[in-house]
Design a protein with these regions (language model features):
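Conserved N-proximal alpha/beta basic substrate-recognition cap immediately N-terminal to
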Residues: 9, 15-123
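Conserved hydrophobic helix-helix packing surfaces used for dimerization/oligomerization
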Residues: 10-11, 155
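Short amphipathic alpha-helix with an adjacent loop that forms part of the alpha/beta core around
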Residues: 45-52, 126-136, 172
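Anionic group-transfer/hydrolysis microenvironments
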Residues: 61, 147, 186-187, 198, ...
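Short acidic/polar capping segments at secondary-structure boundaries
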Residues: 91-92, 119-123, 147-151, 161-163, ...
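ATP-grasp fold ATP-binding core
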Residues: 105-106, 113, 133-154, 178-190, ...
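Phosphate-binding site of ATP-dependent enzymes
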Residues: 153, 159-250, 266, 273
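ATP-dependent carboxylate activation and anion-phosphoryl transfer catalytic cores
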Residues: 217, 234-303
Length: 303
């Protein structure tokens, strides 16, 4: 198939700590090469002549949450000097760096995990974590995480009867998190698995269920989590599609222009309860879905 941008150059964005692309993204690279593109892995935080690339596609830039200001400056630099090349779009990326984007989705009618947002304001009294959890009646305890985070970094569970033991850690996290901290109820449904529904070009592609290791709640592979391909019910796909539509409205973006998105959540009472919308650097589980990498490659070179 001849593509409009055949013989183009594509940068798959990584970071300086791990500059090579992931094993999963090699499938995307190979599919791009098969369509005539020259493909390079390039860390966002390394000197690069970005003007030489037709497409700059964010992939494993997994340190952005450690350096959010620098990352956003880089995104803005690409937007101003190489307009139209970054995927996902700068507007979508800038909006989603801070998990307070969930407020916009909540306002847009999306069912999200109940969240208490705590910000560190000089002179304010830091809330008592024990009292905060008790006031919500969260009998399973809570999960605490920074508003800017990834891969469960600085994320932990607080048992309801041990919250006072976590106060110092909570205060330390709050002091080191300019964007604030999220406190959410622990969801027992996570033991049954967290759904990840992947969309490419605004269309549903495939889904997996991630399960935590025994005794943990984090589903990431780093913590012993497992992944399996699953076919979701049509209603679950529609719930996830509604998340994309709400994100598109919030960022003045067309749904079909969202190159890739991963909608993460649990199922409660037969409906999706959103945990996160990943549009920056999600694992897309190409190895679990034959043909998905080829579909994304075609979108990259044809739009």
């Amino acid at each position: 198939m001849s593509s409009p941008l055949s013989a183009s150059r594509v940068a798959l964005i990584t970071y300086s700590g791990v500059p090579a692309i992931t094993t999963d993204d090699r499938l995307l690279r190979d599919a791009l090469v098969a369509r005539g593109a020259a493909v390079d892995a390039r860390p966002w935080d390394a000197r690069t002549d970005w003007s030489s690339y037709h497409r700059i596609v964010l992939r494993s830039c997994w340190n952005f949450h450690h350096r959010p200001k620098e990352f956003l400056l880089w995104v803005n630099e690409v937007k101003e000097n190489h307009d139209g090349t970054l995927r996902n779009s700068p507007e979508l990326v800038q909006w989603s760096v801070d998990k307070r984007y969930l407020m916009d989705l909540d306002a847009g009618g999306i069912a999200i995990v109940p969240t208490i947002w705590v910000s560190a304001v000089e002179g304010d009294v830091v809330p008592n974590l024990d009292a905060l959890i008790a006031a919500q009646g969260w009998k399973e305890g809570a999960v605490v995480k920074p508003a800017i985070s990834a891969t469960a970094h600085q994320t932990w569970r607080v048992a309801p009867d041990l919250a006072s033991e976590h106060q110092a850690r909570f205060e330390s996290l709050l002091a080191s998190s300019p964007s604030g901290v999220m406190v959410q109820p622990f969801l027992p449904e996570i033991r049954d698995g967290e759904w990840s529904l992947i969309f490419l070009g605004g269309e549903f592609s495939h889904a997996v269920v991630k399960r935590p290791a025994d005794g943990d709640f984090r589903v990431q592979n780093d913590f012993g989590g497992t992944v399996e391909r699953r076919e979701p019910e049509p209603s679950l796909i529609e719930d996830a599609r509604a998340v994309l539509r709400a994100a598109a409205r919030a960022t003045d973006t067309r749904v079909e222009d969202i190159l890739y998105a991963r909608v993460d959540g649990i199922v409660r009472d037969g409906a999706l309860l959103l945990m996160e919308l990943e549009v920056i650097e999600p694992m897309l589980f190409f190895s679990h879905a034959p043909g998905a990498a080829a579909r994304m490659a075609e979108l990259i070179v044809s739009r």
